Regions:
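N-terminal secretory/targeting leader peptides
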Residues: 2-19, 23-121, 129-132, 136-338
């Protein structure tokens, strides 16, 4: 029987575990978990990945070795999910919008503007039936979801102040790929541009794109604020990550090792989500202190104008993500999704 590339990668991953445990001296050959992500080590996700490494290696007494590859050093964000499915990497932490190309468009509902009022509301929602239901959408793709990690709320920037919806007219704004984000920026009159995270700084610097949206920690660690004259602290949409693993690899782990790794992940998740807000506040303070950009804050009336401009995205979203996930969100948040 000829194996596909995906089957081959998964077989190799599971086989490596069996080999490590099936021969004398396996302790000298720890199980390797490669964790690839696209942001810096000193962001909430970066620190969370390092915390998982620390705890997983501690709890398994060295039976597991976690190799963390930040800043797209192993795979770019548009490559990493296929690499996970092929078994070339075992763990990722992509933004949830990255699952739409797999057929799991429902995750994009989390990108709706003004959906979560704060980090606590987001965290509570994802710990409930909504988070479980969404992860089940990945199982048929050979992927298991382990945790949701918070990264705070988006700001948006350009080389001019973005105060009123009309200020967005004709601007090329980089987005990560979410069709929901694409829609709400189009509702504001801009032209969304999908681009790998590792390419954004140069694109901003050279004018390939006019602006972008992201969280304060990502702006600061990637130095986006150094090549954007103005940033609006709008907090118009939430950015969340899902920590996922190659299902065959994870299920092939010995039960005791898997349990210890899951304990490490649970604790790393609590840690990551507990520091996200503080990390973003500190990053925003550093951006302000740098003097390299001007920060703008919306008045209540200006915020309402943005909300009204982006509101058509909600009606459109039902055709994109389906009514079931919107109903789940409405129930979880006790809000009307219209």
């Amino acid at each position: 029987m000829k194996l596909s590339r995906r089957q081959f990668g998964m077989t190799i991953g599971a086989g490596a575990i069996a080999a490590a445990y099936g021969r004398p001296g396996w302790a000298q050959q720890p199980i390797i978990i490669k964790y690839s992500h696209v942001v810096a080590n000193d962001t909430p996700k970066g620190k969370g990945a390092l915390k998982f490494k620390e705890l997983a290696e501690k709890y398994t007494n060295g039976k597991v070795k976690v190799e963390v590859y930040p800043n797209s050093t192993l795979y770019k964000d548009k490559e990493e999910i296929e690499a996970l499915q092929l078994g070339s990497v075992q763990m990722l932490g992509p933004s949830t919008a990255k699952f739409a190309p797999l057929g799991a468009k429902e995750f994009e509902a989390l990108d709706l503007p003004w959906l979560f009022k704060d980090d606590e509301t987001y965290g509570s929602a994802m710990k409930g039936p909504l988070g479980t239901w969404l992860f089940k959408k990945l199982e048929s793709k050979g992927i298991l979801g382990l945790a949701y990690w918070d990264n705070g709320f988006h700001m948006v920037s350009a080389n001019k102040p973005l105060i009123n919806p009309s200020d967005f007219q004709g601007l090329k704004i980089r987005i990560s790929g979410s069709k929901i984000a694409d829609r709400y920026f189009r509702d504001m009159g801009s032209i969304p541009q999908i681009m790998a995270f590792s390419e954004v700084y140069q694109a901003l610097q050279t004018g390939v794109v006019d602006g972008c949206e992201n969280t304060p920690s990502n702006y600061f660690t990637q130095k986006f604020h150094e090549v954007q004259k103005d940033i609006t602290v709008s907090y118009h949409a939430h950015l969340q990550y899902a920590v996922i693993v190659n299902a065959k690899f994870w299920k092939a782990l010995p039960a005791d090792v898997r349990g210890q790794a899951e304990k490490a992940m649970n604790e790393a998740t609590d840690y990551t989500n507990s520091i996200a807000q503080k990390e973003n506040e500190e990053a925003l303070a550093e951006i302000k202190k740098s003097g390299k950009t001007t920060l703008h804050y919306l008045t209540d009336a200006q915020k309402v104008a943005w909300q009204n401009a982006m509101h058509p995205t909600y009606a459109w979203a039902k055709s994109r993500v389906g009514g079931e996930v919107l109903d789940l969100i409405a129930k979880e948040l006790n809000v009307k999704m219209n």
